[in-house]
UniProtKB/Swiss-Prot annotation:
HAMAP family: HisD (MF_01024)
Annotated protein name in UniProt: Histidinol dehydrogenase
Active site: E339 (proton acceptor), H340 (proton acceptor)
Keywords recorded for this protein, A-Z: Amino-acid biosynthesis, Histidine biosynthesis, Metal-binding, NAD, Oxidoreductase, Zinc
InterPro entries on file: Ald_DH/histidinol_DH (IPR016161), Histidinol_DH_CS (IPR001692), Histidinol_DH_monofunct (IPR022695), Hstdl_DH (IPR012131)
Enzyme Commission number(s) of this protein: 1.1.1.23
Domain of life: Bacteria
Cofactor(s) listed: Zn(2+)
Gene behind this protein: hisD
Gene3D superfamilies listed in its UniProt record: 1.20.5.1300, Nitrogenase molybdenum iron protein domain
GO biological process: L-histidine biosynthetic process
Length: 443
């Protein structure tokens, strides 16, 4: 394997990417891009303390942690409705237009996910079915801090709206003055969020999981956040539903020799600029392309506004992997099970059947991951850290629940009741059996 470097304006040499031959460097590759699913014990203790404090002391604890971690002394945790309307009115009209276009695209996609209740008549006239019911209340967590993410507002709100959730609350961290990003507020207005709170961190998760004197308890909490938010969601699961435990962003690009090196480089950068822990990986059978992307990344990273973040992410978690053929590239991608997978190949639809594990697949060189992040329609809240093997993107299904319906008449229980009672006898559950036989005796 060989690292690439770029020279900053201060002449510091910083590693950008490493190149691996999969046949020879497999173990080193997975050490480079492997992710731990464990949380730091100190973070776990801190989150546990925060959750317990909020559960016991409610608003007072939330306000104390908000002052401690966000530097804000709040008189109200909820953003006034007039602030939300003002943010939309004062926003760049072009920004509002693209928010509205994206919102309609996301709604349109999620409408295809809607499940209907069903009923059918079984043997002997028994009526069976399943009723689909939306949850009453949802809380959407929208990250703040290093960047503002109005796209996360739309992506979390749309499936909840389509599902028919009664009340959709949103929370996002404020700054030290108590202000919330106007872009996020404008997006909340477009999405028709019920109300917005200016809270962040584990204390926000706890407040909506348990409820406080002024904050409602919800049924589900969705949305990404930092490690404190992720661990808080994990710990409150059971008190509420959650979407997933989100980790740092990831992209894998599978490319053949015809792929555009600049497209690939910028797509790797796009994921890396999120966070120093983000992962960007190119897998290709073309050594020529691998070297071209490697060299272009080294040449371009220093000119990027978030170049230091990109360089750190690529150095710590990035890789270029040279494989024997495109089929092996697909197998390696499935081993990673990435959040985002781009297929920069001549015939992506022919390759799709070879892919089993990815949160979202982007077909061809012009279907860049950025399109999915903001505009296309499928949800950008995706499984990370290899969990695409068993988790799915955020969807309408996350905001509904299913109830089984069973209807037997007297005549129908008389026809099969003794067999059912006998089944219960074999499990040693006398009351189960006698509950049926009591009905048989009534005749």
């Amino acid at each position: 394997m060989s690292p690439v470097h770029y020279r900053t304006s201060t002449s510091t040499i910083v590693a950008v990417l490493k190149l691996y031959r999969f046949l020879d460097d497999r173990d080193a590759l997975f050490r480079q891009i492997g992710r731990s699913v464990d949380f730091d014990p100190e973070v776990q203790r801190a989150v546990t303390d925060i959750l317990e404090a909020v559960r016991l002391r409610g608003d007072m604890a939330v306000l104390e942690y908000t002052e401690r971690f966000q530097g804000a002394v709040l008189t109200s945790m909820q953003v006034p409705e007039e602030d939300i309307l003002r943010a939309r009115e004062e926003a760049d009209p072009a920004f509002i237009r693209v928010l509205e276009e994206a919102w309609e695209n996301i709604l349109r996609f999620h409408r295809h996910e809607v499940e209907n209740s069903f009923f059918y008549e079984g043997e002997g006239g028994v009526v069976l079915g399943q009723r689909v019911t939306p949850m009453d209340r949802a809380m959407l967590y929208v990250p703040g801090g290093k960047a503002s993410y109005p796209s996360s507002v739309l992506m979390n709100a749309a499936p909840a709206r389509v599902a028919g959730v009664g009340e959709i609350f949103m929370t996002t961290p404020c700054d030290a003055s108590g202000a919330v990003s106007p872009h996020i507020l404008a997006a909340a207005s477009v999405a028709g969020v019920t109300s917005v709170y200016r809270l962040g961190g584990a204390q926000a998760v706890a407040a909506f999981a348990y409820g406080t004197q002024t904050i409602p308890k919800v049924d589900i909490i969705t949305g990404p956040g930092n490690k404190y938010v992720a661990l808080a969601k994990k710990q409150v699961f059971g008190h509420v539903a959650i979407d997933s435990i989100a980790g740092p962003s990831e992209v894998v690009v599978v490319a053949d020799d015809d792929a555009d090196a600049e497209f690939i480089t910028m797509d790797l950068f796009a994921q890396a600029e999120h966070d120093p822990d983000a992962s960007s990986v190119l897998i290709t059978p073309s050594m020529r392309l691998a070297e071209e992307v490697r060299d272009l990344a080294a040449a371009r990273v220093g000119s990027m506004l978030r170049g230091e973040v990109i360089a750190e992410a690529l150095s710590n978690n990035g890789a270029i992997v040279v494989v024997a053929d495109i089929e092996e590239a697909c197998r390696v991608s499935d081993m990673i099970a990435p959040e985002h997978l781009e297929l920069h190949v001549l015939h992506p639809w022919e390759l799709l059947a070879s892919i089993r594990h990815a949160g979202a697949v982007f077909m061809g060189g012009y279907s860049c991951e950025t399109v999915g992040d903001y505009y296309a329609g499928p949800n950008h809240t995706l499984p990370t850290n290899g969990t695409a093997r068993f988790f799915s993107p955020l969807s309408v299904r996350d905001f509904v629940k299913h109830t089984s319906i069973i209807s037997y008449t007297r005549r129908q229980i008389m026809a099969c009741g003794e067999r059912i009672a006998s089944f219960a006898d074999h499990e040693g559950l006398e009351a189960h059996a006698e509950a049926v036989r009591a009905r048989l005796k009534k005749g």
